[in-house]
């Protein structure tokens, strides 16, 4: 991983961890009916997608090893620019299932890389 990507991977990992905390112990129906919670989850997806987009631009080799990077960036773009067409059930599914593996990958990148000075 390139040194300049470290901060972006860190930001992405923090967003993933927030997503996991926000959705832990919450049902899909509770999520869908709670505007504050759904807004918080969507915000973390915006951060996650933007951080991964920066990794993709600055460090394509690392980006190639991030599962579903293009889908995550795409979700970020939909949330940010097509907010009226966001499907809460898809966001819920991504937040509760797909980010688990991503946390492992991002943690591994940070463990393998030395933090830049």
Regions found by a protein language model. Name each.
Residues 1-117:
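Solvent-exposed interaction patches of small proteins and small membrane subunits
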């Amino acid at each position: 991983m390139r040194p300049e990507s470290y901060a972006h991977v860190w930001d992405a990992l923090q967003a993933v961890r927030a997503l996991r905390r926000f959705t832990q112990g919450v049902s899909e129906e509770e999520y869908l009916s709670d505007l504050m919670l759904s807004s918080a989850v969507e915000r973390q997806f915006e951060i996650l997608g933007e951080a991964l987009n920066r990794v993709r631009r600055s460090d394509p080799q690392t980006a190639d090893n991030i599962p579903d990077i293009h889908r995550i960036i795409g979700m970020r773009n939909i949330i940010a620019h097509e907010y009226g067409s966001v499907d809460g059930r898809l966001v819920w599914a991504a937040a509760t299932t797909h980010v688990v593996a991503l946390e492992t990958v991002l943690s591994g990148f940070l463990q393998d890389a030395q933090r830049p000075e």
